[in-house]
């Protein structure tokens, strides 16, 4: 089996905390130097690389003299602010050895949830790649709160892969890859060498939390691969402890787990809607509406809405939830939550009678709706 990375030109590489720190006690400068050297080798092959790197909080803890990861959000944010300085400095110095310029980009969910800011971030990243710069991305932990976090850098890596229409996402971790069961508990567990991204059975194989240094366990990596597949990006989950793992993957060696994007690439606008981690609200729709959305590719009409939850404005992304509580789709609503509460369960012909006006006959037009 040949590595999918060999034929991939635009890569997003995510490196976990344990691979760039000294067991959580500050940054491992030598390890970061090795990552810089490998990425330089990929660049020499004509590949474009965006790096998503953890390590800021661990470096901040070291600089502040803290031995234990704090629980309070303000202390975590302070550690991130201090640590980002060191993280940027080390990466810059190590890449300079290879005559490569780097750029630091700190993102929040709000940056990608707003369409204009999303497009601006995309334009900036593509310009940096065109200029031969290696963007180094992290979540802006200094300003985000729990409610608006990406949650982990695996998810952030997938979102960046979609943002720049990357060919592949490489998630480097301290684990060999995905196993059929927890190898620490099941001696019969075997490595999953290749599977389809988003295959339902993968989530049951994963599970479990990440280390205390980072936030992402294997389940977050599986879900990240599913998300990256929205834009057609394949994913490799591999051990960063393997010597020259990036160079070997680029040479075609199959290492770790390959998750192949087999579904059709979403249109850019629909990718953006699907990638919303938080939505303003949701509507509960009846079984008939679920069937029409899933099988018929229809728009969502007010008559198919059973209930309205949350507060949202016109033009915001909302979720559509079936009677069983599972999300079916999401899309841009033509009506606010207040308006939707007045017109739900009513035929479109009555919208003007109820509201005094009719913006559109649909609550969500099919062109602004994506199945999830």
Swiss-Prot record:
Catalyzes what?
L-glutamate + ATP = L-glutamyl 5-phosphate + ADP
Q: What is its EC number?
A: 2.7.2.11
Q: Pull one GO CC term from this UniProt entry.
A: cytosol
Q: Does the keyword Cytoplasm apply?
A: yes
| Amino-acid biosynthesis is among the record's keywords | yes
Function, please? Catalyzes the transfer of a phosphate group to glutamate to form L-glutamate 5-phosphate.
**Which family is it part of?**
Belongs to the glutamate 5-kinase family.
This protein is called Glutamate 5-kinase
């Amino acid at each position: 089996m040949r590595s999918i990375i060999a034929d991939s030109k635009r890569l997003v590489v995510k490196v976990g905390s344990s691979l760039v720190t000294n067991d959580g006690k500050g940054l491992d400068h030598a390890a970061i130097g090795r990552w810089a050297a490998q990425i330089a080798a990929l660049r020499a092959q004509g590949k474009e690389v965006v790096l998503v790197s953890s390590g800021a909080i661990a470096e901040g803890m070291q600089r502040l003299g803290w031995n234990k990861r704090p629980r309070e959000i303000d202390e975590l944010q302070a550690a991130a602010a201090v640590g980002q300085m060191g993280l940027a400095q080390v990466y810059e110095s190590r890449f300079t050895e290879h005559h490569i310029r780097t750029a630091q980009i700190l993102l929040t969910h709000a940056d990608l949830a707003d369409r204009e800011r999303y497009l601006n971030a995309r334009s900036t990243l593509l310009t940096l790649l065109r200029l031969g710069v290696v963007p180094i991305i992290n979540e802006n932990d200094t300003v985000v709160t729990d409610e608006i976090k990406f949650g982990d850098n695996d998810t952030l890596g997938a979102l960046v892969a979609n943002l720049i229409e990357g060919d592949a996402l490489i998630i480097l971790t301290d684990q060999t890859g995905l196993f059929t069961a927890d190898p620490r508990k099941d001696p019969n567990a075997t490595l999953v060498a290749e599977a389809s991204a988003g295959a339902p059975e993968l989530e049951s194989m994963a599970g479990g939390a990440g280390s205390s240094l980072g936030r992402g366990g294997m389940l977050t990596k599986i879900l990240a691969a599913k998300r990256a597949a929205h834009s057609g990006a394949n994913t490799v989950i591999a051990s960063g402890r393997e010597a020259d793992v990036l160079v070997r993957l680029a040479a075609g060696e199959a290492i770790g787990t390959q998750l192949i994007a087999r579904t059709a690439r979403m249109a850019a606008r629909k990718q953006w809607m699907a990638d919303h981690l938080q939505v303003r609200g949701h509507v509960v729709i009846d079984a008939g509406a679920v069937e029409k959305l899933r099988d018929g590719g229809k728009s969502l009409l007010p008559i198919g809405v059973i209930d309205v939850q949350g507060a949202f404005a016109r033009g915001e992304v909302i979720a559509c939830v079936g009677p069983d509580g599972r999300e079916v789709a999401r899309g841009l609503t033509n009506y606010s939550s207040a308006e939707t509460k007045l017109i739900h369960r009513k035929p479109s012909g009555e919208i003007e009678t109820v509201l005094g006006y009719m913006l559109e006959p649909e609550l969500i037009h099919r062109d602004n709706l994506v199945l999830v």
